[in-house]
Amino acid sequence: MSKKGGYKRTGVDVRYGDESVARFINAVMLDGKKDVATKIVYDAFAIIGEKMTEETPLEVYHRAMSNIAPVVEVRSKRVGGATYQIPMEVKPSRRGALAFRWLKQYATKRGGRSMAEKLAAELMDAAGEQGASVKKRDEVHRMADANKAFAHFRF
């Protein structure tokens, strides 16, 4: 048994009551500045609420996350002196973590405006099956599909 107290789960978000939003705020956070990350995410949700009146920002967020999250990915495995890219199913926790990482990465790369505006734009694009983060998911799926022949090497 661990002496360090174990893993502390992230609680639910204060404003939306959603654990996924709380984890996303933690993913956006830089240098431990959680207040700044919270303001960025809430401002992005407010922008989404203004621009997309037919849906709540939380619905747009969840749709975007399901569109970004990869189902399969490739993992390297060395077999007999050769390294193969083996397609494997992604665990749900990693699926969410990859979606958070890609969303933050490609929102940051967008030009100009504030981070909240860039994040809102990337979330709205991802909810509509567009945007760089959805392209990244498609690229990962294409790699897994191209290496389907090596699926029998699974770990």
UniProtKB/Swiss-Prot annotation:
Self-association and partners: Part of the 30S ribosomal subunit. Contacts proteins S9 and S11.
Protein's organism: Chlorobium phaeovibrioides (strain DSM 265 / 1930) (Prosthecochloris vibrioformis (strain DSM 265))
Family: Belongs to the universal ribosomal protein uS7 family.
GO annotation terms (biological process): translation
Free-text function comment from the UniProt entry: One of the primary rRNA binding proteins, it binds directly to 16S rRNA where it nucleates assembly of the head domain of the 30S subunit. Is located at the subunit interface close to the decoding center, probably blocks exit of the E-site tRNA.
Keywords: Ribonucleoprotein, Ribosomal protein, RNA-binding, rRNA-binding, tRNA-binding
Stored CDD domains: uS7_Bacteria
Identification of the protein by name: Small ribosomal subunit protein uS7
Highest taxon, organism lineage: Bacteria
Any one of the GO CC terms: small ribosomal subunit
Residues in the signal sequence: none
Gene: rpsG
